[in-house]
Amino acid sequence: MSEPVLVIDNGSYEIKFGESGWDQPLRALNCLTKDKYSRFHLSNQTKKMRDISQALIRRPHELGQLVSWELESEVWDYCFYNEDDFHWNLTHDNDTKDHHLVVSETLMTIPELSKNMDQVIFEEYDFKSMFKGPVAQYIPFYQGQYQDDAMTAAEDKKTSSYKDFQLVIDSGFNCTWAVPIIKGVPYYKAIKKLDIGGRFLTGLLQETISFRHYNVMEETILVNNIKEQCTFVPPESYFSSFHNKMNTKVEYVLPDFQTSFLGYVKKPGKEKLTDDAQTLLLTDEVFSVPETFFHPEIAQILKPGIVETILECINMCPEVVRPLLVANIVCTGGNFNIPNFHERLQTELQRQCPIDWSCKVHSPQEKDKSLHGWESMKDFANSDQFRSARVTREEYLEHGLDWCTKNRFGYQQWL
């Protein structure tokens, strides 16, 4: 398309944004942070904090729903008009009035909150046109390769019918969604939600470290960094990893706010520490926390795990497409950066599925799996489907908010 298209993956933890012709998006934390000195840091300014202790974080999303456009618009302005941090400025490239927009929205968004997004996009930012939808809806448009796509031409021809049927597992900051896609359309009657995501893992790790080592209940940024650097999913089972926990132990050096502000993982060997250095020796914590995806009872949660949630989702789909969905499961979201996650998921699902079903779990080739959604949105923005499906500013002004929600972006008619 000759006209510029801005693509925004508006995640509850991090915003990925950029133009449809870019190879990589820009990234900004979707939050406002208050440090212990009562100074406020917006979005990526949080990464420049010298003292992360006792930081309070406020996000525009609550329980997965975008509820605070007062804060979200501040973060968007920071992204659009901050040339110092991003070396890109929307005012240098025409402005929002000359841009089309592709943006993500939470699944099952409350209609009134969805109307708020339409109103802000068309009345405050004046975008030329807009298309919005959940990240899972864009995944079929992904033009990149998956890690296990090295198939022969014969195999590719054999499985070509699967590509119209996908089961998208979107595991992000707030929760994990299982979304069946049939002929490019989410099958809303079978969508299932697991209330375990990145926020939950960070909170559980906080409680575990506070009980066993130091009190870190007010050190959210520190514990989140420990989670990202140290945790992994047991490749076979929790019990086998527990027996070998001393072989996978991790020693994490806590920040001293002079040489380190976030801490780091101590390399085994000759690395010497100062006399006053404080360390955490993490053994079974590094794998027991992510294991809650498969066994929530570890955290005293009496709900189905991710495997049971996926099977329940599949069983609510038409019987004829169930084996096709199982054969084409696509993983997206930041939690799939945890090592061994998608491999373990495939192993556990294959055990639970009928013996004549072939279970295949695909993971994108991107090193950071959280970028998969933005890449899919970018490919959609460059397609003809975007031109025919978008809502223009003129249509919005003519028909109004209710028309957009009911006839174009609402999901209620699919239920």
UniProtKB/Swiss-Prot annotation:
Family membership, please give it: Belongs to the actin family. ARP6 subfamily.
Q: What subcellular compartments does it reside in?
A: Cytoplasm; Cytoplasm, Cytoskeleton; Nucleus
Assembly, in brief, is: Component of the SWR1 chromatin remodeling complex.
The primary location reported for this protein is: cytoplasm
Tell me the GO BP annotations in alphabetical order: chromatin organization
Question: What job does the chain carry out?
Answer: Component of the SWR1 complex which mediates the ATP-dependent exchange of histone H2A for the H2A variant HZT1 leading to transcriptional regulation of selected genes by chromatin remodeling. Involved in chromosome stability.
What cellular component GO annotations does this protein have? Answer: cytoplasm; cytoskeleton; nucleus
Q: Does the keyword Manganese apply?
A: no
The record's listing under Gene3D superfamilies reads:
3.30.420.40, Actin, Chain A, domain 4
Q: Which residues form a coiled coil?
A: none
List the lineage, top down: Eukaryota, Fungi, Dikarya, Ascomycota, Saccharomycotina
Q: Which gene specifies this protein's sequence?
A: ARP6
Q: Which Pfam families does the UniProt entry name for this protein?
A: Actin
Q: Which organism is it from?
A: Kluyveromyces lactis (strain ATCC 8585 / CBS 2359 / DSM 70799 / NBRC 1267 / NRRL Y-1140 / WM37)
Q: Which InterPro entries match?
A: Actin, ATPase_NBD
Q: Does the keyword Calcium apply?
A: no
From the Swiss-Prot or TrEMBL record, give the protein name.
Answer: Actin-like protein ARP6
Name the UniProt key words of this record, in alphabetical order.
Answer: Activator, Chromatin regulator, Cytoplasm, Cytoskeleton, Nucleus, Transcription, Transcription regulation
